[in-house]
């Protein structure tokens, strides 16, 4: 195991916290972001700004062409983003087919290239209800595959798997992180909508920690 990791960094608050957690543990971090045609592409600008300011190596991979075979999600297609909580069945519209398997596979290749011993991504307990590729059984199987897929074994790790978003935020606050440097909303507008599942979960996390969210919202749910 090396002291270097690849962190899949979307620009959202979970991966933002994960990025800084890796650095706090003394690991060398390679940040990897993906443009897969998401309507909230502004998250990539936020990610780039953070990495530039922190001096973190950062690559953005354009895989928009894959949307031709990964359609049907409200995040990438002309489908309305549902409002409400992640526990609601309508939130399945935000699932991008096979997204994390693809992203983790590409990140594993990058890890081999950079000599990193693991890929970290921000799957957490709040994702389990809607996203199959954020569940423990998925992570376990991807970890097993990626350890034997190359001559150099690469582990797949989700350090927040047993935590909810409120607990993740609490960890970040302990590190003194500034969450104005993140973007969470699934809608790609100037202000966060405050109503999509991602916004609702974020607002609940800040409320649970008794802290005001620094982002501006169109209106609150």
Curated annotation (Swiss-Prot):
Q: Which residues bind Zn(2+)?
A: 185, 193, 196, 199
Alphabetically ordered keywords of this record: ATP-binding, Ligase, Metal-binding, Nucleotide-binding, Queuosine biosynthesis, Zinc
The protein's required cofactors: Zn(2+)
**Which EC number(s) are documented for this chain?**
6.3.4.20
State any GO BP term from the record.
queuosine biosynthetic process
Q: Which residues bind ATP?
A: 9-19
Q: How is the cofactor bound?
A: Binds 1 zinc ion per subunit.
Check the record and name the CDD domains matching this protein: QueC-like
Q: Which family does it belong to?
A: Belongs to the QueC family.
Q: What is this protein called?
A: 7-cyano-7-deazaguanine synthase
Species whose genome carries this gene: Marinobacter nauticus (strain ATCC 700491 / DSM 11845 / VT8)
């Amino acid at each position: 195991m090396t002291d270097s990791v690849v962190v899949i960094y979307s620009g959202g608050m979970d991966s933002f916290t994960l990025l800084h957690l890796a650095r706090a543990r003394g690991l060398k971090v390679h940040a990897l972001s993906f443009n897969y045609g998401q309507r909230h592409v502004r998250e990539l600008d936020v990610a780039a700004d953070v990495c530039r300011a922190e001096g973190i190596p950062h690559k953005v991979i354009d895989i928009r062409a894959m949307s031709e075979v990964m359609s049907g999600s409200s995040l990438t297609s002309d489908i309305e983003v549902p409002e409400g909580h992640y526990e609601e069945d309508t939130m399945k519209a935000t699932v991008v087919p096979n997204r994390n398997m693809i992203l983790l596979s590409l990140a594993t290749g990058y890890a081999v290239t950079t000599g990193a011993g693991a890929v970290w991504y921000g799957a957490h307990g709040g994702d389990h209800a809607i996203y199959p590729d954020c569940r423990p059984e998925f992570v376990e199987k991807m970890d097993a595959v990626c350890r034997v897929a190359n001559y150099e074994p690469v582990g797949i790790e989700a350090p927040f798997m047993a935590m909810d978003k409120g607990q993740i935020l609490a960890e970040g606050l302990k590190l003194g992180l500034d969450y104005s440097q993140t973007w969470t909303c699934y809608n790609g507008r100037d202000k966060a909508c405050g109503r999509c599942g991602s916004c609702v979960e974020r607002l609940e996390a800040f409320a649970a920690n008794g802290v005001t969210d620094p982002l501006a919202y169109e209106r609150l749910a």
